[in-house]
Amino acid sequence: LPIEVVRRCREAVGEDFIIIYRLSMIDLVPNGSTQEEVVQLAKEIEKAGATILNTGIGWHEARVPTIATSVPRRAFTWITKRVMGEVSIPVITSNRINTPEVAESVLADGCASMVSMARPFLADAEFMAKAEAGKSELIAPCIGCNQACLDHTFSGKLTSCLVNPRACRETLISWQPTTSPRAIAVVGAGVADCTR
């Protein structure tokens, strides 16, 4: 079915349209796909007309953490590196890549053609501008806590970020510089308060 879906999409949109297919590279659940099956599907998806393969790591039901703080940075890039040797289209990797330096090392090591990030952009909406300006030390990093992003999403609450209180509230709160600045002290501040 996935191969047919990609084939039909390619027929519908023509050759000059990018089709990104998200493929679970490792399921991390009992009776999940084997690496051989993943590679075989990746090859068939490429033949069917996908332009890029995007990496999925594990299922939400998996008992293996994939994005938590305890997971080492770039921990699953070995999986995309293995698939890259089997297909000729670009392969995107993800999971626990939360600084420009980590992303660059993934690319330099040939573990992926591209890097996907999501939570780092919740943590700091200016991530790319700071990275491009060579000021990565000013980026408020995603700490992998998943408390205000995933936990809120799964409980039907507004997604946010513990290190960025503005995340997902950009249109609800108007942040304007004060006309009468004052010196204040924050007592009992957590890590999120100290990053700004």
Predicted regions and their residues:
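Flavin-dependent oxidoreductase catalytic cores
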Residues: 1-196
